[in-house]
Each structure stands twice: as C-alpha cells, then as structure tokens.
C-alpha cells in the first residue's frame, strides 16, 4: 500500500511536524574492545575539575584522595567541583522552609521501607561487579556469591532475609582482618581422544580458596567496575559507566529511596515519574509561570545543559545533605544513610580489561592488563595514551584508580535532583528580594529554567544569579550548550514543549518492527507497540493502520510465513502451502503459519491466538496449544511478559505484552560453548538459584505470598506450607488418607536431613 507523503501534512500544526526531522535511522553505535581508555579519561577529567582541592592519603587502603569541598570560589566560566558546604546546606534548608515537613515525612516513609525490604531487592538489575571473582556477573549471581562468602566467614546476620541485616554484615566485613573467598579457575591439559586418537585440550574447572587481607578486601568492596556505554547516538566519543559491587548497592538503594520520596513531593522534579504523568507535572510549572507573568512582565525559558554533572558532584556534599535532611531522626537511620556517600568518597574505579597490542609483522597479539599499567614502559603507547597513563599513575593501586571526587554515571540520580531543585526553589521573589524571579524543572542533570522579569535587563540579571548560585554547589551550567527562548518553546528530557508538550512520535520509531524473540512474542510485541503509540504518542488511525500493514509485511519476511495462497517462494512455502490446503477454516491459521492477518486498529489488544481461536480447525487447535509437543521447550508463560524496546533516545524501556503459550513460543537453546569455560560453575550456581526460586513460588502463589517476616529459611517455610495445605486438602476430601500420610512423611524426612546437615 503506497501513501502519498504530502497527504500526511494536511491540517497538521507546525509543531507536530517535529517527527519528520528524525535523524536516527539504522543501528546505534556499539563499543568494541576495552573501556580502559574511557575510564582513564573520566578519572583524569574528574581530578582536573577539582585540582585545587586538598590531597590526603586514605589510612586503610593507602589511596591518595583529592577533596575539593570548600575549595576556591571560581574566577572564570570553566567547570569546577568546588561546592561550598554552607551554601548547599542553606539551599536545602530553604527547600524545607518552602515545603514544611517534607524531610520529616520522607524519613518516616524510608524507615518503613528499610524495615520491610528483603535481600532479594538486590537481585534486580543487570551486570554487577562481583568482588569475589573480580569481574561482572548478573546481579542475582553476584548477590548469591557475596552471601555465600559472608556466611563462610562467619557473617550470618543476612540469614534473616532482610536487606538491613545484610548491610550489617557488610559493615562487619570491613572490620575483619581477613576474608576467605572461593575463586573459579580453569585447568587445561592435553589428552589423547580415545575415538579419534588426536590430541585435544581438556578443560576442567577448579575452585580454590584465597585469603584477602583487610586492605585488599576494602579495595574490592569500594570498587566500581567500569564498562563502555553502548548505543549512544549523536556522540563521536564513547564514555565509561560504572557498576558498583554488592557492598555499595544496598546502601545506595536506601539513600535513593529517601531521595525518591522527597522528589515525589517536589513539583519541579522530573523524577521519579515518567511518560504522561511527567508531562502533566511539568506543564503545571510552565502554566504557573505563564499565568503569573502579568502583561507587564517578560518570561523566558532556558533549555539547559550542565557540563559534566557527575564529575563535578561530590559525595561529601551528599553526605552533608543527608546529615541535614535526617537531623532529627534516630541514630541508626542516620548511620545507615550516611554510609553510601562515605563509601563513594573512598571509591576506586576499576580500569577494565587493559590494552590489546598486536604486532602486524609477527602476527602476535597480547593483552596488557590494567594491573600492569602502573609500571610498564610507556614507549609502547601512542602520545595520547601515554599522557593519560602518566596522569593516572599516582592514583593506581592493584589495577584500580583512586577516585574520591565525582559520582560516576547514574548513581545518585534522585539525590542530585533534590540538590538541583533546591537551587530552583531559591528563585522565589521572597528569596531573590528583587524584581526578577525564577522557577523550573530538574531531572537528574537535565534542567529547564523559566525566568520572569519586568524587562530584558532583569531577565539577564536573573540568569546570571542562577548561574552563580549553581556554581556554589558544584553545578556548572554550560553557557555554550544552553539556549534561551520566549517561554512557550523549550525542550526538557527529550520532551518538546510548544504551548503544551508535542508528541514526538519519531522517538519511538526504532521500537517498531520485529523483535526477533520468537514468532509468538514478536507478533504480540509488534501490535502492542502500535497500540501504545496510539494511546500515548498521537499516532493517528490512518498512520496506525499503515504501521500495522508494514509490520505484518516485515513479520512475514522475517519468519518466511507468507500467506498459503501466495506466489512467493521461500524455504517454508512448501510446508505452509500444504497446511493451507488441508485447513478447512483458513482464517483460523496464525500469520506465522501462513494465515491471513485479522488485526486492525480496533482489536490490537487481543492476542492473536484468542482472536482466531473460534475460527480454528479442531485438530489445528490441538497441535497449536499442546504442552507435550517435544519440539518446544516450554517456559511456564505467565499471562503477561516483558519485552525490552529501544526508543531513539534514553534507556531501553520495558514494555508489557500479553503472552499466550503456544508451540510458537519456542526458546532458543543456550550456546554450548559456555559449558566448557570457567563460567560453567557460575552457570550451574545460577540455575540452582533459579530452581530454588521457582520451587518457592510454587508453594507460595503470588496471591497468598506475603513476604516472610520471621527468620525461617525458605525450606522451613515451604515445609510448613506443605503441611498446612495437605491438612486442608485432606479434611475437605480432595486427597486420600494414604496421600496425606505420604506428604507428612516427606516433610519429616526433609526436616531430619536439615538437622543432620
């Protein structure tokens, strides 16, 4: 179906045409190789911004640390990290004055959360630095390893299952003279294969015990591993992001809980809400400024950009903020919240894999690990790398760099937003005590500033005052990258505002198309994306209908499942034609089996299997929904699954879609090659962990599953649950006496085995 593109522009207000300026087609750039160079850049830049601070040596780890707090006041427009403690505290105090009781209430909410949060909160999240193996792992595995090591070192508070008790173990672990850990390693030996009589390399996995002294353990506990941020568009250079270990994560989580609770109560905060809710919140602030700028007043808006937000923030400043926010709270609460910023003041950045060298003439490749950078001869490196290494050398310890100032990306988004909002809050007339006043929006490092004044000089003065106030707390507004406009047109967190937020539908374009999970999920995700964009992004009915037809076309080409009566020849067409001919009700065939498309914009919310169920031949129904089909490894599919969709900007979003389990919901098998590496032990641990969790969920279906409050183990909980259920089933006649007796016997056996162990 071809559409004349000029038709799309009839009757559209100009601002809605923003979607046509979309530059990002094709795949975003991904990084390859090592991130060591980018990490060194970050470390060196951060120290440069704070270079006039004071140097100290950490007595425990021997790491040199730079403290820029209360450093010299800036004399130029260069970015700097010299935040002034008294200014930060005063800004936060005024924020409380404008919002009476806000900190008090947020502290109470956070205390409640701390009491109830379970350890498994930390299993959420992707790659995590696993300090026991000194590399990245999935969060669940890293947590399991940490707990295992803690227990074998006599730290057992975590057995209660509460996160706060695991954190108690973390604190105790830092006082221990040594920690014993288990590491995985790989042995290779050459053996003769019995069948082929050739020599082959056989790999075996070993586990060995290793002792870390206090200093080595502390360095690992304070380490953030670094990686290169992938899929960033519109940048020539890549940059490094950090992933902290399990010791830091729990503390950060509680600090962010407190900060999130505060942000929810601040009208200028773009976090933690998102989507339409965020747009509504922001539109309110703009409306307030426009209605209050009477006819005599001018109103201008800055679409703001801050220079290197993270690298100029300072954990010591966050410590001061937390100390103030929690000032009337119980001692234990203040201690728990102050640990994260203290750990960040002493953090170490792991430099990653190191550098790869290759000699073209000798066809040799060799890896220089980060640990060797401290004393390798620099003649092997090019000019720019040599400079980087020279600069970072004084900071190196065991392949990690001491990085006291700066925050690393994405660590304290909520708390830094509170700091930003507290500066916006100072724009009220009762604080500026003059004719200009300001307000605005803040979301992590992104901001929009609205300034009102009787004339242009007033606007200029207001902007200058805002700029200087920010400098005092380590926020550097970039004069080059920010621009000012009459209020009514600005951009904030990729939302474009023009007399109301404009739907920028093109942002969602990359998420249209076939995801490549499997036939069942892809169909469901595809139509859900179109449905969601009709709801949220002004995707009109005609365009949606066109998107749907393009999607079906794309889907058929991807899975080679053109209609059974088509002339197109593919690898599958012989089988699909045969199926088409022997099917009585052809409308009942799924699109992936060569059937027709029955979707239109009115029924996108119905899964395809349900849409066609009544139209299917009976034997086709039986084949399609057959859990015993040996060719399909069935996951137990819940009614709702999550897919990851990629918008053009910003992080990948998780999107729910309906999942109906059919023989099309196949899961590709895992690559075998991993089973021969030292990952194997880890993989087995992970599967075991998974099995335990699945079993536990069988006993406690979500409706009845209240988080256990006592300190019973998972096994005890399941056994007692089994006994209760068996008794109920026996008394209501659902199971026989023999079955009841057998269940009771199994329960007793399990308890006996636990006692013996």
Swiss-Prot record:
Residue numbers covered by motif Nuclear localization signal: 187-195, 203-216
Q: PROSITE patterns recorded for this chain?
A: RDRP_SSRNA_NEG_SEG (PS50525)
- Gene3D superfamilies per the UniProt record, alphabetical: 6.10.140.720
According to UniProt, the reaction catalysed is: RNA(n) + a ribonucleoside 5'-triphosphate = RNA(n+1) + diphosphate
Q: Name one Pfam family in it.
A: Flu_PB1
Presence of the UniProt keyword Nucleotide-binding in the record: yes
EC number annotated for this UniProt entry:
2.7.7.48
Q: Which GO terms describe its biological process?
A: DNA-templated transcription; symbiont-mediated suppression of host gene expression; symbiont-mediated suppression of host mRNA transcription via inhibition of RNA polymerase II activity; viral RNA genome replication; viral transcription
Keywords associated with the record: Eukaryotic host gene expression shutoff by virus, Eukaryotic host transcription shutoff by virus, Host cytoplasm, Host gene expression shutoff by virus, Host nucleus, Host-virus interaction, Inhibition of host RNA polymerase II by virus, Nucleotide-binding, Nucleotidyltransferase, Phosphoprotein, RNA-directed RNA polymerase, Transferase, Viral RNA replication, Viral transcription
Free-text description of this protein's post-translational modifications in UniProt: Phosphorylated by host PRKCA.
Q: Does the keyword Nucleotide-binding apply?
A: yes
What InterPro entries does the record tag this protein with? Answer: RNA-dir_pol_NSvirus, RNA_pol_PB1_influenza
Q: Region Promoter-binding site: which residues? A: 249-256
What GO MF annotations does this protein's record show? nucleotide binding; RNA binding; RNA-directed RNA polymerase activity
For the RdRp catalytic domain, which residue ranges apply? 286-483
Q: Which GO terms describe its cellular component?
A: host cell cytoplasm; host cell nucleus
Predominant subcellular localization, coarse grouping: host cell
Q: Where is this region: Disordered?
A: 50-71
Q: Where in the cell is it found?
A: Host nucleus; Host cytoplasm
Q: What else is known?
A: SC35 was derived from A/Seal/Massachussetts/1/80 (H7N7) by serial passages in chicken embryo cells, thereby acquiring a multibasic cleavage site in its hemagglutinin (HA) and becoming 100% lethal for chickens. SC35 was then passaged 11 times in mouse lung, yielding the mouse-adapted variant SC35M.
According to its UniProt entry, what is the function of this protein?
Answer: RNA-dependent RNA polymerase which is responsible for replication and transcription of virus RNA segments. The transcription of viral mRNAs occurs by a unique mechanism called cap-snatching. 5' methylated caps of cellular mRNAs are cleaved after 10-13 nucleotides by PA. In turn, these short capped RNAs are used as primers by PB1 for transcription of viral mRNAs. During virus replication, PB1 initiates RNA synthesis and copy vRNA into complementary RNA (cRNA) which in turn serves as a template for the production of more vRNAs.
Question: How does the record describe its quaternary structure?
Answer: Influenza RNA polymerase is composed of three subunits: PB1, PB2 and PA. Interacts (via N-terminus) with PA (via C-terminus). Interacts (via C-terminus) with PB2 (via N-terminus); this interaction is essential for transcription initiation.
Which family does the record claim for this protein?
Answer: Belongs to the influenza viruses polymerase PB1 family.
This one is known as RNA-directed RNA polymerase catalytic subunit
Task: Provide the species name.
Answer: Influenza A virus (strain A/Seal/Massachusetts/1/1980 H7N7)
């Amino acid at each position: 179906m071809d559409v004349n593109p000029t038709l799309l522009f009839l009757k559209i207000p100009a601002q809605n045409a923003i979607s046509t300026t979309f530059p990002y087609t094709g795949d975003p750039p991904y990084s390859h190789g090592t991130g060591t160079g980018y990490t060194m850049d970050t470390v060196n830049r951060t120290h440069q911004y704070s270079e006039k601070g004071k140097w100290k040596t950490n007595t425990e780890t021997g790491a040199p640390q730079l403290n820029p707090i209360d450093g010299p006041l800036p004399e130029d427009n260069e970015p700097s990290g010299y935040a002034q403690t008294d200014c930060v505290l005063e800004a936060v105090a005024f924020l409380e004055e404008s919002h009476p009781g806000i900190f008090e209430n947020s502290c109470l909410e956070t205390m409640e959360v701390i009491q109830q949060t379970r350890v498994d909160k930390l299993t959420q999240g992707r790659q995590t630095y696993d300090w026991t193996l000194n590399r990245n792992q999935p969060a669940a595995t890293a947590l399991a390893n940490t707990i295992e090591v803690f227990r074998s070192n006599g730290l057992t508070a975590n057995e209660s299952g509460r996160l706060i008790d695991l954190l108690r173990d973390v604190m105790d672990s830092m006082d221990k003279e040594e920690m014993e850990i288990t590491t995985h390693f790989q042995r290779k030996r050459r053996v003769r294969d019995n069948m082929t009589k050739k020599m082959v390399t056989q790999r075996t996995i070993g586990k060995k015990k290793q002792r870390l002294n206090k200093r080595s353990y502390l360095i690992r506990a304070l380490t953030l591993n670094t990686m290169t941020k992938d899929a960033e568009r519109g940048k020539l250079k890549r940059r490094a992001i950090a992933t902290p270990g399990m010791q830091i994560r729990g503390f950060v989580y509680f600090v962010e809980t407190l900060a999130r609770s505060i942000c929810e109560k601040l009208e200028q905060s773009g976090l933690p809400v998102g989507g339409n809710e965020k747009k509504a919140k922001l539109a309110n602030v703009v409306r307030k400024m426009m209605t209050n700028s009477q006819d005599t007043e001018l109103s201008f808006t800055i679409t703001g950009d801050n220079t290197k937000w993270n690298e100029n923030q300072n954990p010591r400043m966050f410590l001061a903020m937390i100390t103030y926010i929690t000032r009337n709270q119980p001692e234990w609460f203040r201690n728990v919240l102050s640990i994260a910023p203290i750990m960040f003041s002493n953090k170490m950045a792991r430099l990653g894999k190191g550098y790869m060298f290759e000699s073209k003439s000798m066809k040799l490749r060799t890896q220089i690990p980060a640990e060797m950078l401290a004393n390798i001869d620099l003649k092997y490196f090019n000019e720019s790398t040599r400079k980087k290494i020279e600069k970072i050398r004084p900071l190196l310890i065991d392949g990690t760099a001491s990085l006291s100032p700066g925050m690393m990306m994405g660590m304290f988004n909520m708390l830094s937003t509170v700091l930003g909002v507290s500066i916006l809050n100072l724009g009220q007339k009762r604080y500026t005590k003059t004719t200009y006043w300001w307000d605005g929006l803040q979301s992590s490092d992104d901001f929009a500033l609205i300034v009102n004044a009787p004339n242009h000089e007033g606007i200029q003065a207001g902007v200058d005052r805002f700029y200087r106030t920010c400098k005092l707390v380590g926020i550097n507004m970039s004069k080059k990258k920010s621009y000012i406009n009459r209020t009514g047109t600005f951009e904030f967190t990729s939302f474009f505002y023009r007399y109301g937020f404009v739907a920028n539908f093109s942002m969602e374009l990359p998420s249209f198309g076939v995801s490549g999970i499997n036939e069942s999920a892809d169909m469901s995700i595809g139509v859900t994306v179109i449905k969601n964009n009709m709801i949220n992004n002004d995707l009109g009915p005609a365009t949606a209908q066109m998107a749907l037809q393009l999607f079906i076309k794309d889907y058929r080409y991807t899975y080679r499942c053109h209609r059974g009566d088509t002339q197109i020849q593919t690898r599958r067409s012989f089988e699909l034609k045969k199926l088409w001919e022997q099917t009585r009700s052809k409308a009942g065939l799924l699109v992936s089996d060569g059937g027709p498309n029955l979707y239109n914009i009115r029924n996108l919310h119905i899964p395809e299997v349900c849409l066609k169920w009544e139209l299917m031949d009976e034997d086709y129904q039986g084949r399609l929904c057959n859990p015993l089909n040996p060719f399909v490894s069935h996951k137990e599919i819940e009614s709702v699954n999550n897919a990851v969709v990629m918008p053009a900007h910003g992080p990948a979003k998780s999107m729910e879609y309906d999942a109906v389990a059919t023989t099309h919901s196949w899961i590709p098998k895992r690559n075998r090659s991993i089973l021969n590496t030292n990952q194997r032990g880890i993989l087995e641990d992970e599967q075991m962990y998974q099995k335990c969790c699945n079993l536990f969920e069988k006993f406690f279906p979500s409706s009845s599953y209240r988080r256990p409050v006592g300190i019973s183990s998972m096994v005890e909980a399941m056994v007692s649950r089994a006994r209760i259920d068996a008794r109920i089933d026996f008394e209501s006649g659902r199971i026989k006496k023999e079955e009841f007796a057998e269940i009771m016997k199994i329960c007793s056996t399990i308890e006996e085995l636990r006692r013996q162990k």
